[in-house]
Amino acid sequence: GISLSGLASAVANEGGVGVISSAGLGLLYRNLSKDYIQASIMGLKEERCKAREKTKGVIGVNVMVAMSNFADMVKTAIAEKADIIFSGAGLPLNLPSFLQKDSVTKLVPIVSSARAARVITEKWHNLYNYLPDAFVVEGPKAGGHLGFKDEQINDEHFSLEHILPEVIDEVKDIETHYGKNIPVIVAGGIYTGEDIKRFMDMGAAGVQ
């Protein structure tokens, strides 16, 4: 696994947000438990602890909605006081339900459309009186489970350059309606400093 404590702490030490992937930890930590679910929980605790020993920076956890142990990983990340949970590969509609009164973890959905941002916001507010702390917007060139079709990958109508302004406009409406600042972070197919500047100039608050 690449997206574990080593990379996360290195990124955090450089001023970025270090992210630990929760996917497949039960396989990496089979020595701790023969039960995959339990090994995954113990593995996430171990990786979070290792990261914290190496940095005082921001450490987040990525938890995919599509994972069978989604709830266990979210609960563990919150209990371990992860700074942020990033969640995509589906709409994380029930993510705020796992927060406790003393929870410090911020919740950041990963979306690929303005509509997804609106649906998540309305659901979270109506059911949990909670609003996203930020959004990550991924285009078809991002690695992961995005739901884009093959023919859409190189279609400019589905490009990040096309999607980002739509999401930013949607989030501006959300900010105005609810009175909360919600940063929009852009991700997928961004390689160079020029790429970063281009998307920041378009209104992105950050780049992944």
Segments (PLM) and residue ranges:
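Active-site entrance/lid segments in N-terminal catalytic domains of soluble metabolic enzymes
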Residues: 1-178
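Structural beta-strand/beta-sheet cores of well-ordered domains, especially the beta-sheet scaffolds
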Residues: 133, 180-182, 205
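Structured core elements
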Residues: 136, 185-186, 208
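Short, catalytically relevant binding-site loops at active-site mouths
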Residues: 142, 190-193
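A general structural signal for well-ordered alpha-helical packing
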Residues: 164, 193-196
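Glycine-rich beta-strand-to-loop/alpha-helix junction loops that act as flexible
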Residues: 183-191
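A compact, surface-exposed functional segment
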Residues: 197-208
